[in-house]
Design a protein with these regions (language model features):
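Alpha-helical scaffold domains
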Residues: 1-161
Length: 161
């Protein structure tokens, strides 16, 4: 566990996009827990969003729990702010279907964050039937716990439970 976290920290210090992606690809099979997965947010990736998006879409199609979780985490960290955001990313994440707890929780976390940053676009996904019910309810719960979601928005979200 500690060795993998150290390896992840070294990857995060990478200053070159190509070498960072290469090291990340080699490291993916060793990610076996949520903590190691969620710490991986190399800053260099934020300067190469179009290229990174291709990788993210590949990773979203993976059968591996933590590769899918990493892809959603990258979408949450790098693509929900106004400069990089596009509505289609919400649809991509909503389409992720998994029985894996750590994937479902990341989808919920993504949508809770989307409700804080892109409320109007994320809100329709909180309607019943737009995603797996358990995940939808978790997303609402996490949004209600967030300090970044306004009291008015929280009041409406409560009515959707």
């Amino acid at each position: 566990y500690e060795e993998n976290n150290l390896h992840g920290l070294i990857i995060m210090e990478s200053k070159d996009y190509g070498s960072c992606i290469g090291e990340l690809e080699r490291f993916l099979p060793y990610i076996d827990n949520w903590a190691t997965c969620d710490m991986l947010r190399p800053k260099i990736l934020s300067k190469h969003l179009p290229e990174l998006l291709e990788k993210i879409y590949q990773w979203l199609a993976s059968e591996d729990t933590y590769i899918v979780r990493l892809a959603i985490g990258f979408l949450m960290s790098f693509y929900l702010d106004d400069g990089a955001y596009q509505r289609e990313y919400l649809a991509k994440v909503a389409e992720v279907s998994s029985k894996e707890y750590y994937v479902r929780m990341m989808v919920a976390w993504y949508f809770a964050t989307a409700l804080a940053k892109q409320y109007q676009d994320a809100l329709p996904y909180m309607q019943k039937g737009r995603m797996e019910e358990w995940t939808r309810r978790k997303a609402i719960q996490k949004a209600l716990e967030s300090r970044r979601v306004s009291p008015e928005h929280k009041e409406y979200l409560r009515s959707l439970r």
